[in-house]
Amino acid sequence: DRRLGTNVSFRSFVDCCHEHGIRVVVDGVFNHTGREFFAFRDLQAHRDQSPYTRWYRNVNFDWGSPLGDSFGYESWHGIWELPCLNHRNPEVRDYLLDTVRFWVQEFDIDGIRLDCAGDLSFEFIQELRRLANEIKPEFWLMGEVIHGEYARWVNPQMLHSVTNYEMHKSIYSAHNDHNYFELAHNVRRLEVVGRELYTFVDNHDEDRIASKLLNPAHLAPLYTLLFTLPGIPSIYYGSEWGIQGRRGHNSDTELRPRILPPRPLAEEMQTSDGQNTGIRTDGNCQSFSSATGPNIHAGANTCCQTTSSTTDSNTDTSAGTVTPLTLLIQKLAAIHAAEPALHGGRYQELLLTNRQYAFARHGDHQAILTAANNDDNAAYLQVPLPFHTTAEQATDLITGKSFLIDKNTNKIQIELEGNSAVILGITEG
């Protein structure tokens, strides 16, 4: 894939990431192939004489596909450009597992995001997990699963994590509809497995959150909840600048723009034939860019302003412009990294209304308390503490503002501005 550069430059990129404490997870499409895949091309050329007749599901030479093939086959959700692989065939499983071995040995990747994991056989996933444990014990397997009971996929025999689409839907509608009850219900329902799930507010298949929110001011409480509720929070590239984008009819182009790096860096990324690989040629991996999709320059002036993905690509504004939203997400990421309670801590609901929501994540004799307000008006809350404390106040880890604790009621008095949230560190005893 030329978008990743050459084998040498991609290995250099992975090595640089490891030097900076960053792990690299690549996308693996093991459910289906394209029509240009060697096995499918051979099947087209040799029909029932091809050694790959059993590589695909339900190959039938009694009828032809809508794309003019002289045979039929099972396609992914009726998309004939994507013929489905037959994972019951040991040759297919061996080929896919050898592919994983290659990417680990050649590039030292740290994990795979399994595309369409909900369509893969459990037997294949279990075999993949055994291989991962064998070749790299800390190798991370995350699956794209949209519907179903996530615990069926997330367990010691299967995957480490799957996409939490339930939270994705409830976290934005909780703000659009002023209904934190929906979000809290999903958190409680997924409590057992929730801390292992991959949480997000937008991705390459879903409209940008800046386009989905009816009120841009909700970006602040929404992202605060993303980083403090159970789960593994993620940011889709460009959304840290408030980029907008909606999925078009049979097109994801607006969701996957090319973000231009600052001009000097862009020049460093040019190959000898003028192609932008998205990877620096000097071995410095501190910055890189996507090399596909329409050009945009990301930037916003306030936390509540957003940037359209159809911005004129000839403007002088470059990617990487620091905005209040960018700074907030940086701060939230730093808080999440520094607080063990936010990694695997037990969840406890403390206060819930349609427009205000407070909960704690428990650590070792301490807790992180988050309170959010989706109303345009300020809210004055009396939030019960998760345990008794001798402290007289608690400090917001985002702003440094302090809030008083009432020793008589064991409640903390929190004044929340409209469309805001706080994260408080509280010590037990």
Question: What label would you give each PLM region?
Answer:
Residues 109, 159, 231-232:
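A structural motif
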